[in-house]
Every structure is written in structure tokens, then in C-alpha cells.
Amino acid sequence: MTSAPSSHDGQVAIVFEDVFISFAGNEVLRGISFRLPVGETKALFGVAGAGKSTILKLALGLLKPDSGRITVLGNDVTEMKEGELFGLRGQIGMVFQESALFDSLTVSENVAFRLMEEHGIYDADIDRRVREALRFVELEHTVNMFPSELSGGMRRRVAIARAIITHPELLLYDSPTGGLDPVTSNTIVELIMKQRDVYKTSSLLVSHRLQDAFTMATHQFDQSSNTLRALPRGQYCDVPMSFLILRDGKVIFDGDIRELAHTKDEYIREYIS
């Protein structure tokens, strides 16, 4: 799999500029602004209804803001038509809490689904890439199984394989560990970190578990041992990671773990405690 361009190129994967959106007269996002540099990871937090998933839908062009500007991979999605957005989404991998696998298709067919939309790819190449993606999530043995034969955690891992098979420039995760037990959640987080540290793919992660993001900020995937390695105190992973916290539709924090640990904001201190 290929990696995204380095953030040192000065490129930005996502930019939100003063974005507002309301539903039925209820203002969900109020002047949201943030940037995700290429190759970096940003974790979004906030109480239920804070607008985290709405941000992902806006980035995909599934929703249009009432005002403001959203740029994704250099494209102004607020001005794009559906046909143009379809092409852009082909450069984005998505993993949601509900893995949404097709029960009538095998694991192999599910993972290959997005490749089927591309032209000029030989069956042998599709099979190779499917096995490569499943090997990455350590599920190559499930290639001929059906989703009904998999556990919830395994289904989520297949969803990750499907998201990365097209070598996306951007990954969007919407509560990828939601509904999973702690052990399985840790497995999913490890795979997300593996993708981050091996391929440096730009990622926007919505999570309800602060523990997941703290693990990501204080550990690094070690390719030689195929395990996570805790970083020495004061050392941080090679791939920059930041935290964005929402409250009442506004960004109240956007910074790294050092800044988060030293914040004076009482609401944030209580939220992360």
C-alpha cells in the first residue's frame, strides 16, 4: 500500500472555515474552524449531539453547511455537485460504528467492493489487493467466509480492510470502537495506529473513548515486532496527532496532548478526567 504525501509538503487534507449548520432550527455547528494537515491524525471529542458525526458528513459532502467553507483534499466540497463528490469520495476511506457489510457477499467480495467500481483492474490484481488488505488486519483466513460467521470485532476489522484497499489519501473513522468490548476495542485502535504509523494516511477520528486517543498519542506501532510500543515519557509519535473538543457547537480546544494535559479550562479538565 502506498502512503499519503508528507505533511512537510505544506498540504492540508481538510479545512473547515467558519462553518455553520442547523437542523430544524437547532444550530448544531456554530462557526467551526480547524485544519487537518496531510499525514496527520486528529481525534474529535464532545458529548452526544455535539456535532462530531455531522463534521464527517460535511467533509464527505453528504450534508451542505448553511454557511462557511469546507475544503477536502484541495476541493471545495461546499461548491461541488454530486457527480464530482462521487469521484472525491473514491479517495476517502470510511469506517463507521456499524460496519455495514453486505451479508450476501463473502468477506473477499465485501473488501473488493470499491475496487469493482474501478475499470481496468484485473481479477488477479483484485485478489492480491484483497488478501493484502485482509493480511494487514490479520484476517486473511476469513477470505471465503460470510459476515454472519464473524464476530462484531472481526466485522469491524473487515470494514477497515475495505476502507484501506483503495489506498485512500484520507481516512474518516466514526466511532470505530463503539459497541465493542475493551479487548476488541484495543485491537481496533491498534489497527488504526498501524495504518497511521506505517502508511501515514491523513485521518479524522470521531470517538467516544478518550482512552483510545490517549493510547494513540502515547504509543507507536512497531513494525519489527508487529505490536504497539509505549513511548518514553516526553516523547511523542512520529505522526503528529491532535485533539479537537466540541461544546455547544463550537471548538473549545484544538491542540496536542501536551497542550491538553496543561489546559486551564475547567470544563475540559473535567471532561478528560
Question: Residues of each region from the PLM?
Answer:
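Conserved ABC ATPase signature
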Residues: 146-150, 154
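Catalytic Walker B motif of ABC-type/P-loop ATPase nucleotide-binding domains
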Residues: 171-174
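Conserved ABC transporter NBD signature motif
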Residues: 68-76
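Helix-to-loop junction immediately C-terminal to a conserved catalytic motif
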Residues: 60
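Conserved catalytic motifs of ABC-family nucleotide-binding domains
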Residues: 167
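The feature captures the beta-strand-to-loop junction immediately N-terminal to the Walker
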Residues: 45-47
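Conserved ABC ATPase "signature" region
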Residues: 75-76, 123-142
